[in-house]
Amino acid sequence: KGYENESKLRQDFKGEPIYKDYNDMKAAHAQIKKGLSQANPIGDIAAATKIMKLLDPGSVVRESELAIAMSAAGRLDRLQNFADMYITGKKLTPTQRKEFSALSDELFAAAGDQYNKKRSEYEGFAKRYDLSGDVLGAPHEGNSPPAMPTQDAVAAEIERRRKK
């Protein structure tokens, strides 16, 4: 009976929407990192497309939306991007790659936190009925999403940028 109960617990957990969402996010995060590490046009397009899919999972990424994502940068970066595209055929600047990578990390961390909350809930069920929580799989390990900056920190950053 213990095996059947643990199997049912695992099945119920895997049926939770957050389980699928987390595993989709995990795969997308790995694909984004791999695409950005290529530092070439195909990798850039793959990473940018995957970022757009993460932001709106059920959507089809249109060329115009992809262009918006890839041009998201300040004027200096856009100028650098244009020059790089002209000379090397690359699509994203190093700064844009870092920003895409950081966004991917933050989205993955947030998904991991939600996954771990739901997993903890099921671990509680397992303990209550004297079952092994190991059947749920490993928890997400990684950084938590960054905390929102304080109002003072935001004001200090604005002041620092004004002085430049």
Regions found by a protein language model. Name each.
Residues 1-148:
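A sequence/structure-level signal for intrinsically flexible, low-complexity segments enriched in small
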Residues 141-164:
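Terminal short linear interaction segments
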